[in-house]
């Protein structure tokens, strides 16, 4: 075997030895260094290498980024430190975000909590039902005043209707006067009144409210069909208070209706014209206006405004005409004066002209 062949054989053996060692220690940088060191040693004259070199890898541990150091033991017994050129990869600087695990635990409500909520709701309803209503407070306040009739509080639906009263369609508003009469006001404006002896609202009598164009604005005609023992009747109309009195009795201060809440007071006067029997005119302060009356009032105001505007326009035109006439007269006077001055000037010229000659 020639010298070149031996060198190639030694190089291949050393390369195989170094590659097996580096693969076991995860360092690929040792192969090139060992091969170069072995080739340099073969060039010195050592031809036969009967045994393989022992390679041991030791980490430097000096810190991050420092190359690894490999200890190579040659067959002659010498130990050589070989430093790897290829550096080990650094760990990633980017840190993965910390994921927090949240556990959601649902606590099922027990039957005891549901029962306690039901009991609380019942107690709350009882407390609200025990509160006095505004009708009860109004009756307590008006009990000392004899002129104010008491308003009975409407019974709840739970109490039910008495067995001796037949079920019927009751109007929206039911009132009871101080004489014990029931007064019902339907949605259409019909007033119904019942005597104290009748059962409940079965003996209601129909009363009609009509508006007439003959009375002054704000007056309301109330027609009733029945009378009480003393010849007078009292009932309430929603939004106002009306006291109806017979023609034969005189009007006394006690017959004045007392206002309760936001209900204004009205004074009843005996009719001065020939009205039918049982018809009384109630003079209101202007709060009882039907939609037709409101429309008529708006039309009347509009016509009055237009009439005032027409009168103002006529007056303005008249003043302008007078001013123009005054100016024309002044112009005429000035023209006459101008003519006179011209004539005087001519006469003066005639008088002065011979002297100049």
From Swiss-Prot:
Localization per record: Nucleus
Question: What are the bZIP domain coordinates in residue numbering?
Answer: 299-357
Which residues carry the post-translational modification Phosphoserine, per the record? 116, 142, 284, 287, 290
Q: Where is this region: Basic motif?
A: 300-325
User: From what superkingdom does this record's organism come?
Assistant: Eukaryota
Region annotated Leucine-zipper sits at: 327-348
Instruction: Establish whether keyword Glycosyltransferase is in the entry.
Output: no
Its annotated function is as follows:
Transcriptional regulator that binds the cAMP response element (CRE), a sequence present in many viral and cellular promoters. Isoforms are either transcriptional activators or repressors. Isoform Delta is an activator. Plays a role in spermatogenesis and is involved in spermatid maturation. Binding of isoform Tau (activator) to CRE is increased by CREB3L4. The CREM isoform Tau-CREB3L4 heterodimer functions through CRE and may recruit HIRA to CRE to regulate histone exchange.
According to UniProt, the name of this protein is cAMP-responsive element modulator
Gene from which the chain derives: Crem
